[in-house]
């Protein structure tokens, strides 16, 4: 009987799960502007004072095998200089195709050395399914 109680007490935290108060994951905004995707981030207190820096922007495309493969990346993780403004388009120099499926991941931080302010935005999209701005 005592073993059942120990098991019950141990299993409760696993069944209830963990509520993440400061979830680092967000959904990136992707719209169509001048026939090109406009990738932006918004709705986060770390962006409010205009000091958040772009650490990484990664773009992947679905290949012929149906797998996502990285096709473009801007990596400034060690020395970030680009300041992110909420709702501002982040430049991506890549020749997008209308029917291809893409996945974008944006990582920001403010200040860059503070782990608790790192945020990750992600989104899958197709150019021909985006809403024009």
Protein language model regions, located:
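Contiguous beta-strand segments within globular domains
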Residues: 24-51
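Secretory-pathway extracellular proteins and peptide precursors enriched for disulfide-bonded cysteines
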Residues: 9-10, 29-30, 79-82
């Amino acid at each position: 009987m005592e073993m059942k109680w120990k098991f019950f007490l141990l299993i409760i935290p696993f069944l209830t799960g963990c509520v993440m108060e400061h979830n680092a994951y967000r959904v990136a905004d992707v719209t169509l502007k001048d026939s090109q995707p406009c990738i932006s981030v918004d709705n986060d207190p770390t962006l409010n004072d205009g000091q958040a820096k772009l650490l990484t922007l990664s773009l992947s495309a679905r290949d012929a095998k149906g797998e996502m493969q990285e096709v473009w990346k801007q990596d400034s993780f060690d020395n970030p200089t680009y300041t992110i403004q909420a709702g501002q388009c982040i430049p991506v120099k890549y020749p997008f195709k209308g029917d291809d499926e893409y996945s974008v991941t944006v990582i920001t931080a403010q200040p860059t050395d503070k782990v608790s302010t790192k945020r990750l935005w992600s989104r899958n999209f197709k150019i021909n399914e985006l809403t024009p701005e």
